[in-house]
Amino acid sequence: MAKAFQKTASALVCALLCCALLLGCALLFVGCESDYPEIRITLTFNDNDEDTEDEYVLDYKLYRRIYPQTVAHYLELADLGFYDGTVVHDYRSDRMVAGGYTYEDLASSDVSELKPLDYAAATTGADGAVTLENVSTWADAEMTQPLNRLYGETSANGFSVANGTGLSNKIGAIGTYSYITKADAPSRTVFGRSSGGSAVREVNYYNNSVTSMFYLYTGSAGGSESAFCVFGELANAASQTRFSELMTAISDYTAAMQEEDDSFTFTETVTDESVVRIADNLASVGYYEVDEGFSVPVAKLIITGVTVEKY
């Protein structure tokens, strides 16, 4: 009887230990996802000139607590290595837009050789099925047809922050970006939700069309965005300093070039159809065009990598 009791007790202890181990692993997994993940964006400016080439390392704090779907989407793309070797393709008055283009040869290609990335190939399989783990939009209300587009956690899409204190633009802030307009898909709708526990709802496609593009805010005057989601900010003083130094480097480069040629501009407008016509099977005609073109930096801003430093 004593031996039987010992066997039973041993089995019970083993079972309890196994349960404790499984619980610990589960808690560890959950603990890996923080409210404020961090990414590191590493870029170079004007790397064709070895005398002035410099690397800028920018650490970003992302706000998963406020924008869960947006943060999950960009973290997954970063983990896929999607952004490695991409460029800033549109340098606007208050932001630099990236995440959608590269060059055939990052060292020698000029502005005319800008080319789009194949987002569809990176996020769907050979059968056309979406391969992303984080899905926030679907073609149907039953959620049987996942899409590789991001649900718009924006006020224009009816999304609101619980306490009303979402992020707004300030120097260095990172936000979602898309060029599509209502005219490009006037009646198209999809189904989406802002987080796993919320109900799916029918929404306009043009507010839920983001794929991989993002912007870094460069303007001096900030403000809120209605169509785009500001989901992160520079994480520390060192990154703020480096971002400021990058802006200074661009300004100094432009001034130096203008001393040699007073007609010099930092960007060149590209309107070539192969560049500004963006393939989109959910748009009315299967694509949309950026009519005003892109203001492409003539001295490349290359994103050499985006890595997740903290989940």
Can you name each region flagged by the protein language model?
Residues 1-40:
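Gram-positive cell-envelope targeting signals
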Residues 31-311:
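Cross-family detector of peptidyl-prolyl cis-trans isomerase
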